[in-house]
């Protein structure tokens, strides 16, 4: 009886190790929603960090009308949106926003699926940023 218990215990230990090793190789995406004050702090902390990217996923027209300084534009409505995201480096940290939080909320599962390491979503989009009094720049 003891021998059977030891065999079962050993088999369970081996399965636990194998399962643990399998999960360790996949990078999990860290997604966090932040308000405008937290987003501003992130931008200030990473001002000179080439591994920090501000990503505006609104249309090019919305982007030109006003965006967060330093942001790059990838249009959520573009037919190749997912492919454009897939071309971006996955190991950088991203602050993502749209107009109201709707598009960025829909985009978060895509970031996860593509294996991005760390993504911050601006809650309620650029509207919340603007209403909080933070600056916007216009043009390209």
Residue ranges and their predicted role:
Residues 54-56:
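Structural scaffold elements adjacent to functional motifs in cytosolic proteins
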Residues 96-97:
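Short, surface-exposed ligand- or partner-binding patches at beta-edge/loop junctions that are enriched
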Residues 2-10, 15-52, 61-93, 102-140:
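Rhodanese-like catalytic fold shared by cysteine-dependent sulfurtransferases
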């Amino acid at each position: 009886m003891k021998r059977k218990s030891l065999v079962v215990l050993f088999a369970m230990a081996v399965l636990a190790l194998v399962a643990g090793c399998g999960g360790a190789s996949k990078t999990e995406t860290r997604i966090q929603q932040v308000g405008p004050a937290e987003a501003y702090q992130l931008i200030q902390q990473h001002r000179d960090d080439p591994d920090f990217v501000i990503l505006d996923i609104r249309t090019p027209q919305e982007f030109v009308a006003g965006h967060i300084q330093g942001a790059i534009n990838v249009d959520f409505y573009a037919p190749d949106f997912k492919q454009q995201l897939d071309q971006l480096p996955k190991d950088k940290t991203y602050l993502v926003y749209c107009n109201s939080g709707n598009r960025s909320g829909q985009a978060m599962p895509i970031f996860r699926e593509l294996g991005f390491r760390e993504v911050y979503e601006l809650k309620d989009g650029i509207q919340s940023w603007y209403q909080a009094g933070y600056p916007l720049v216009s043009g390209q």
